[in-house]
Amino acid sequence: MEEFHKVRRLPPYVFEQVNRLKASARAAGADIIDLGMGNPDLPTPQSIVDKLCEVVQDPRTHRYSSSKGIPGLRRAQAAYYARRFGVKLNPETQVVATLGSKEGFANMAQAITAPGDVVLCPNPTYPIHAFGFLMAGGVIRSISVEPDESFFPPLERAVRHSIPKPLALILNYPSNPTAQVATLDFYKDVIAFAKKHDIIVLSDLAYSEIYFDDAPPPSVLEVPGATDVTVEFTSMSKTFSMPGWRMGFAVGNERLIAALTRVKSYLDYGAFTPIQVAATQALNGDGSDIAEVRAIYKRRRDVMVESFGKAGFEVPPPPATMFAWAKIPEKFRHLGSLEFSKLLVEKADVAVAPGIGFGEQGDDYVRLALVENEHRIRQAARNIKRFLSSADETMHNVISLNAHR
């Protein structure tokens, strides 16, 4: 049978190669320290779990829910934006609950993309930013990920040389995988650019609450008039350690939110109602749960930066997110990130995410997730130190993928 058209358009999912190797090593008895997938290990706060258990006892909540999210949940998200960013949103027309931000992004692509539409997407970036539009028939044009003045000249060229004119610009700050953070001044320039060229802005703000200094990352919607052209996506997965609950939001421009809501109405009935009620309680909380999660990730970040640095693997301290973006040690860089990641599993019992999985501009890097405790992170550093010190004896039979390019 011939491969299906949409499946054929998708690039290989390179993370799966590392996952298979990791599973094989574990089956053979290896203790793999997994810094690869950004899958939080922290428990969901007990008060949120308790609310779920309470509400699930009511059989009325076992029926179909609302695709756009129950009213109380949408009001809670609007209230969060007002508290955190000073942004006023209408919960009826500017907020929709999604099954995680990933689903929201993919369905927004389905809602707004015509075959051949050009989308400006950072490289490297989280895969759904590009893949969602590829599956919807769009064309990706890669742009820089640095949120500074160097971002705009290539953007202007992309607009001039793209036929048709780009439909949308994707932003992701704090960035997954690079952990870079944007400023409000940068966002002001982005909105001015988008309005000048009549381009939609889609902002992924999944890591807004995971930051490690006294400057909370801003929302692009803080820019006056941003809702004229912008939708922003958030997630409860990292903020409240709720990845398996699948709860996120899209907020912003009424026309775009209406389009997403309509597409979703054909595809799902929303999250299980008790999950939505528990999420409402989380959003209406005093913020102490968020502060505790943030503090744990900061301690893990500091341990990783220190211990990996002593091991000979320099890891720049990320200012935000639950990830570090580290350049592959120079003697291994010629291998590319996929082969280096495989080596770490085989020789050091450590799993990381190869940078190539986030775009070709990431191939000199690996992403390290802060999803193991401090003891395990130090153990990973010791394993890597042993691997690096013995690499000259073990590398003679490793062939670089780049040698065949």
UniProtKB/Swiss-Prot annotation:
One of its GO terms (biological process) is biosynthetic process. The modification N6-(pyridoxal phosphate)lysine is found at K238. Its cofactor is pyridoxal 5'-phosphate. GO terms for cellular component: cytoplasm. Its EC number is 2.6.1.-. The keyword Methyltransferase does not apply. GO terms for molecular function: pyridoxal phosphate binding; transaminase activity. It comes from the Bacteria. Belongs to the class-I pyridoxal-phosphate-dependent aminotransferase family. This is Putative aminotransferase AatC. The gene is aatC.
